[in-house]
Amino acid sequence: VPPEGYWDRVQEICRKHDILLHIDEVVCGVGRTGTWFGYQHWGVKPDFVTMAKGVASGYAAIACTVTTEAVFEMFKDDAADPMGYFRDISTFGGCASGPAAALENMRIIEDEALLDNTSRMGARLVANLEALAERHRVIG
């Protein structure tokens, strides 16, 4: 867990120097921290987010990058074909099983309230780790 104010400062520096803020959610994304994405715990507004395994819970190959409209506009190089730049940059492009698995995975996460369960289990884990740290000075 980053120190308090860390992400605010990172975001401030990026905005000040016109640097795009990329958040890699391959490990923390898609419900693994009690929110859809780990960065949501700190109110960060990234310019683009990458995610992979968790999108389909490992049942199908899928990875994706999600971005803002402003970043998307930067990549357009042909007004007649606004998707031209993005057409051939996908490892799993054209494979429908990944997106199908992702949609079903997200439906299950919502239907079974797994974000809430993750939050409860996370709080339980933290409480138990804190109890261990109190008993063993080498922890922490």
Residue ranges and their predicted role:
Residues V1-G140:
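Conserved N-terminal phosphate-binding loop of PLP-dependent enzymes in the Aspartate aminotransferase
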